Regions:
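Sec-dependent signal peptide recognition
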Residues: 2-7
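C-terminal motif of bacterial Sec signal peptides marking the signal peptidase cleavage site
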Residues: 13-15
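Short, low-complexity N-terminal intrinsically disordered segments enriched in polar/charged residues
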Residues: 17-60
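Core segments of small alpha/beta cavity-forming domains
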Residues: 42-79, 86
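Signal peptide-directed secreted proteins
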Residues: 51-57, 93, 153-158
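Short solvent-exposed beta->alpha transition segments
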Residues: 68-113
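Exposed beta-sheet edge and beta->alpha loop/turn motif
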Residues: 110-158
Length: 158
């Protein structure tokens, strides 16, 4: 019986052996798929495309007239999803909560290294300053809008 306990104790001790610590010679280079870009480094054509189409979409809320995107401006999925019904429904919610749209202010540009897409994040300025909203416009490598979305930013505690 003592032999079994001793054998069991030996097995438990051997299985609990810790791994050898890293010697530090095996350093891996940090790789990040998403890189935050400086505004000046970004292609001005892509920057202008994102701003113009984002502003055109948000001004629809003020004027109730939506000019649909062309195939040169946006991908098929964006054209298909940007319907007058969807936009007007979203605009009604936003206008009730934020008031009329005033302008966009570029806050961040993120480059996806693998797909060569650029994500432009804009702070949306509205009449009412109670809630902050952000517009995200994704431009693909062909210079077309691949995605557009808006979201309300969380309030920062004082």
């Amino acid at each position: 019986m003592q032999k079994y306990i001793l054998l069991l104790l030996l097995i438990v001790m051997a299985s609990c052996k810790s791994k050898s610590p890293n010697s530090g010679s095996e350093t891996k280079e940090a790789y990040s798929r998403y890189v935050k870009m400086d505004f000046k480094e970004v292609n001005s054509a892509k920057k202008n495309r994102a701003y113009d189409l984002g502003k055109r979409l948000l001004e629809t809320c003020n004027t109730s007239k939506f000019k649909s995107f062309s195939k040169e401006e946006a991908t098929e999925s964006v054209i298909k999803n940007a319907t007058v019904e969807k936009i007007s429904k979203t605009c009604q919610k936003i206008i009730m909560r934020n008031g009329k749209f005033i302008d966009l202010q570029l806050s961040e540009v993120i480059h996806d290294v693998e797909t060569d897409d650029y994500l432009f994040k804009y702070k949306i300025q509205y009449e009412k300053k109670y809630f902050e909203r952000e517009l995200n416009v994704k431009i693909n490598k062909d210079g077309k809008v691949a995605a557009m979305s808006t979201k309300e930013l969380a309030k920062k505690p004082m």
